[in-house]
């Protein structure tokens, strides 16, 4: 669905009116397109932590141009499209001043749609209390910058565990690219990869890999299938038998296979096991299928409660368990679930949905350590307001509020969720597990 306000304030007349009366002026986000340069350019590298050499290696591999950082003594107005600050060596409160000085001197140099990444050491990996406090303080800085910089600029914090330096590349590539246009203010933890350092074709990272996507006949599920196929995957598109016609169209559009399966059926696990026995194991499984049955809990029927939990939570749990126990996932496999901002913040009239999506977060956090023994990662995305057929049915004023209540002042697109899932499912993302990444433009809900 089109965003009329976004189009209006970016027209010549609308821009003048918005400036005159002080209306928000969000910029249309620049998203990745095939054939475009992968990373922002040029990018400032600053900080002197243990990750600086790895960042420079990644920049060299991606032809990213490093730019000179401005300082308080040597200011500069030359525009840049990104900044990476390695704060992994910050060990006390005094050293936090280095971040103030850097961002104070360089914030105005960041161009529209720029990407900012701060690298740190997670507090649980710090050597003492002063270091742990200083590293935890980075979260407040990053979330504040994400709200202050505006102009479609995004800001993230990546905590990299000691020894996990080689796990950084896929995450840094993602957060410095247009693929992460609607992800901002996020904190991601990297540990040592569960499956080593595989050889990667960065143009077609899923080449030779098989992916299963549920709820794939339309909307976000279709976008996920399209992005995975674009990046080389053979995609099995799953949806309920009632959606067979649109499912077959979706599968055909990505050169994949349509499989009509009710994931809540009593024999769904047996059907999955039979499919794997006939066709082979998967490398990527995306639990996207979900439903809503909105009512306040006082008015909600038992059937509405149970059906939402069955589709959104029970089915992903049962299918994931069957895949892990029954050799349905290859080593180096990826499970990605779809949670929601509602699962983090709750929502009026969605107690069933919020319960199910909070449960998905519990599934990810609980299953990740178990899956690691099989060299499999488990993660989730938590979308905010995404422009879909479902959100198009929301009453106008509520829909507009949902669009504007984030730092980017607009709704996301299904491809924003799909690109984030593709990063989590990436063969080089073995160091990312047990994480829940919001795709919400830094929504005020649950902040």
Model-derived features: where do they sit?
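Glycine-rich nucleotide cofactor-binding loops and adjacent beta-alpha elements
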Residues: 1-205, 380
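Conserved glycine-rich Rossmann-like NAD(P)H-binding loop of the short-chain dehydrogenase/reductase
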Residues: 64-70, 233-248
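Residue(s) in the substrate-gating loop at a strand-loop-helix junction
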Residues: 340
